[in-house]
Structure formats: structure tokens, C-alpha cells
Amino acid sequence: IAIENRSFNCSGISFVSREQWGANQSKPENYFKTLDGVPYVFYHHTDGDECESRDNCAEIIRKWQVCHQNTRGWDDIAYNFLIGGDGSVYEGRGWRRVGAHTLGYNDISLSFGFIGNFSNKVPNCKMLKAAEMLIQCGIEMGAISANYTLHGQRDANCRVCPGDTFYRNITTLQRFGGKLNRFVCTDPPGPCRI
């Protein structure tokens, strides 16, 4: 299905649309809108290769989308947006769309997938700045509540995402919300071979 409500009028952010990174079509089932002003933002890492160029990032994202749709049976790539090592923001499900990223919170949050494994290091400054600017844009357009709290997936699910080192960094941020009351534990989905 076509993705609507796309707004890339965020000052200073280098957006890469689904068309630009070569996305497959979303499956139409259960592709619902989230509410305006979601109260939670989740940072994830893709737990795989990093990328430093648009072509390399696009290639990695296409592989993740195929895994999420074909191996895991999801409607689309899990994340609302992905952030590459080049500092660009890649459109996943986009604004105001339910993701498949954080059990129990998919319909009341947005997710940013940082491309790479951040268990032993923090994403680079360009990536962190892009995420900060994306949140501010989301607030300005009404997609994210001005009173949002920021979390890693491990604050809501039994996962190590977004990696130990990145998570320690997140805990120092002003809007960090910590472990959430509704905490969901399930077996992790099957691995993606990216």
C-alpha cells in the first residue's frame, strides 16, 4: 500500500524516502496509524553491519526489510525510521504508523533503528544529531508528544537492544524514561542473516 502522511519538511535533516532506498511495497494487513503525539520514542540498533554511504545504507535496509517481511512475516520493516552512519534518516514505516519494534508499545510510540551494532560503542555524532533533530521535527508536526520519554527496547522488552554501550549513553539523556511498567517478555524472533 502507499504510505501517506509523509512529511520531510524537517530543517537540517537529510531524508531518504522509501523510493530512494528501493523499498518493497508494504503488506496491507494491519498497517494502522498511531495516534498523534505518541508519548514514547524507542532507540534500537539493527545489530548488524554499519553503513557510511547512502548506497551501502540502502542495501542494508533492503535486506532488513526482506527479512522482516518474509522471514518474520511482518507487514514491513519494523522501524518508523532508520539512521545511517552517513547521518541520513531513512524512511521506514514513517510518521504516524504502527511499527513492529517494541512489543506492547508499537501503537503508542515511534522507533528509530540505528544501523549497526552498538553493544560496544555509541553511534557516531551525525547519527545522534539526526535522531535529536528527528524527534524535534516530530514534536513540531504533532507526531510526538512534547512530554515524550526516550527508551531503549530493553526498557519494555526482554532484549539487549540497543546494545550495552549505546544504552548507557541513552540513560544520560534528559528525556530518558527508564524501565516501563508494562514489560513484555517473549522469545526473540528468528535471526536475520544480513
Go through each PLM region and give its residues:
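Basic/polar, cationic surfaces and motifs that engage anionic cell-wall
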Residues: 1-46, 84-194
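Active-site acidic/histidine clusters and adjacent loop/turn architecture
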Residues: 35-69
